[in-house]
Amino acid sequence: MEVLEEDLTCPICCSLFDDPRVLPCSHNFCKKCLDGVLEENSRTMQWRPSSFKCPTCRKETPTMGVNGLQVNYLLKGIVEKYNKIKVSPKMPVCKEHSDQPLNIFCSTDLKLICGSCATTGEHKKHVFSSIGDAYIQEKSSLETLFQGVEEWNSKEVHSHLDTLESNKRKALHSLAKESDKVKAYFEKLQYLLEQKKNEILSDFETLKLAVMQAYDTEINKLHTVLSEQRKACNIVEDLKNISDPFMFLQQMQEFRDKMTFIKEAPLTTGQDVNVNPAMKEFDTSMWDSIKLGEVDKLSLPQDTTSKKEPGDAKTLHSLKPILVVACLILLLVTFLCAYPFIDSLPTFTIDLQVISSYFFTTTAKAANLTILFWEQLSEELLILKQRCQTYVSVFLENVAEFVCKYKL
């Protein structure tokens, strides 16, 4: 049909021929298309053209008006028949026998078949009907089938449908709850990982502080020695220009003091200060074997070469309030009791001398003995004060080291 339509198409308007006219060169065009060609020619030329060229072959054709051209009745009739065929519905064809129209109705199987199916196929011994008779028969059968559809009980289907939709909602709700659980699990895991990361990085900061404390002390000592050495060199340069004997001798004394300090200053060995020897073998790949539920076990390696430490971290954390309170009490006792009492002993001795003189005016010897006793007691208490200060300092240093070591 498409190939036929190409032959029935006007070359100018590319549509099916409408009142086709044939030129002397045998080419066909629509009447209205030729009118347009002639009108265009008359506009472009100052005088009336005596001929025009065929739009297809460019052959000259005498101008005698489109109405004077011969109508191609044969082509016009073919176009009209083609339009009727094109508008009419197409007859279905057989799927098993290509291009064979389904023009026979098998009354046995109640289906359309082609001639080949009726003679050679599985329908060979079936009962056949014409298309018209089959149409009437199936039309009456439609009413019977429609009544069966109306009488069909759909309540059971609706019941099953409601059950399925209810089960679907329950399943989706259950999946949503499980999805929320999974989301909460990973959010918790993410929180634990972030918390553990911050804890381990905090441990690294503690190690950095320990390294800085270990190295900075020795570095500062060496800087001090170098500074004193530069000062000593400056003193030597100044001594070369001093002519005053007294000033020279005074500067020489300062120079000898600095030289003594420089020579007696202890020099470090320059070796590495390993704060945590276990960190030498530290590798994050050792955490790969830890399960998700055991994220809390992630930690930096601990130094096992030091003194034995308490193993229960919870016990250490529980002692934190007690240690803090003990330190506060010790400081309070030290500063509120020791210092005011001991520092006031000399004044107390003088007051005691006055009181003794008042009560023992008749016995000067007893007063002198009493004053001597309290002077000796004051000396002993002053010695006790110094020792207490030393013990308190040592105790506070040990407490600070303990707190830093176990991160209380």
UniProtKB/Swiss-Prot annotation:
The chain crosses the membrane at residues 322-342. One of its GO terms (cellular component) is endoplasmic reticulum membrane. InterPro entries: TRIM45/56/19-like, Znf-RING_euk, Znf_B-box, Znf_RING, Znf_RING/FYVE/PHD, Znf_RING_CS. It holds the Pfam family zf-RING_UBOX. It is found in: Endoplasmic reticulum membrane. A zinc finger (B box-type) spans 89-131. Pathway: Protein modification; protein ubiquitination. A zinc finger (RING-type) spans 10-58. Its main location: endoplasmic reticulum. Zn(2+) binds at residues 94, 97, 117, 123. Keywords: Endoplasmic reticulum, Ligase, Membrane, Metal-binding, Transmembrane, Transmembrane helix, Ubl conjugation pathway, Zinc, Zinc-finger. It is a single-pass membrane protein. GO terms for biological process: protein ubiquitination. GO terms for molecular function: ligase activity; zinc ion binding. It comes from the Eukaryota. PANTHER family: BONUS, ISOFORM C-RELATED (PTHR25462), TRANSCRIPTION INTERMEDIARY FACTOR 1-BETA (PTHR25462:SF229). E3 ubiquitin ligase involved in the retrotranslocation and turnover of membrane and secretory proteins from the ER through a set of processes named ER-associated degradation (ERAD). This process acts on misfolded proteins as well as in the regulated degradation of correctly folded proteins. The C-terminal transmembrane domain is indispensable for the localization to the ER. This is Tripartite motif containing 13. It comes from Xenopus tropicalis (Western clawed frog). The gene is trim13.
